[in-house]
Amino acid sequence: MNKNFMYGIGAVKYNDFVIGYIEKGSFDLNGQKAEAAKIEAEQAPGAPVLIIPQSNGSIAPTFNVIQTDYKNLHAMLGGTLHYAKEDTEKNNPIGWTAPQAALLMQGPFELELVSGRSILIPNGTLLSNLGGKLTLTETAKIECTLEVAMPEDGSQPYGVFDSKTLPEEWGEHKLPAAGAAAAASVQSEEATSKEG
């Protein structure tokens, strides 16, 4: 598999919960361009004299979940699961009712791609609602937007890694520190120059 490309959503994971089937063609990274203020001068027509960065580019993925079994509705929208009276162990829900208060799914998300990479988001907030058309050619769906926020420790908002070799820090739902990555890169360059 060529790892020079990122494509195909394999799974969306919240903590260790795998969110159900994603509607074909609905997943969009929804990338936002970086913003900058352009300072222009009368004496320099045609081009700015200074560009001041305002914000980095960001992502806010959107997607539709079409697997609307009761447990998935409960996990993604909140509310209450209902069980038959004889189901004392509450194994097989027979219904779901919507929540009275807003559900906040906030925490670590992993977007595992078919191409062999994963997008790791330490601090995401999933906003979702029940939507779709009830026809014989479409299904109801849970319409989702995953907002990416800065982690509490001020580290990077997201990162891309090989799915088979996720960083050790991800065990604690954190990304490697930028300084550690830079130091590893310098050490790697020094080792390469000594070999040559």
Where are these regions (language model features)?
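Extended, positively charged loop/linker patches that create polyanion-binding surfaces
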Residues: 77-113
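Beta-strand secondary-structure signal
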Residues: 60-64, 108-110, 143-147
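Short acidic, glycine-rich loop/turn motifs
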Residues: 13-14, 111-115, 150
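Mixed-charge, glycine-accented linear interaction segment located at domain edges/termini
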Residues: 118-196
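Histidine- and/or cysteine-centered catalytic micro-motif in compact active-site loops
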Residues: 64-68, 78, 114
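An acidic intrinsically disordered interaction segment
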Residues: 21-31, 104-116
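Solvent-exposed edge beta-strands and adjacent loop segments
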Residues: 1-73, 125-141
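Short, surface-exposed beta-strand/loop "edge" segments at domain boundaries and coil↔beta transitions
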Residues: 19-20, 71-72, 113-121, 154-157
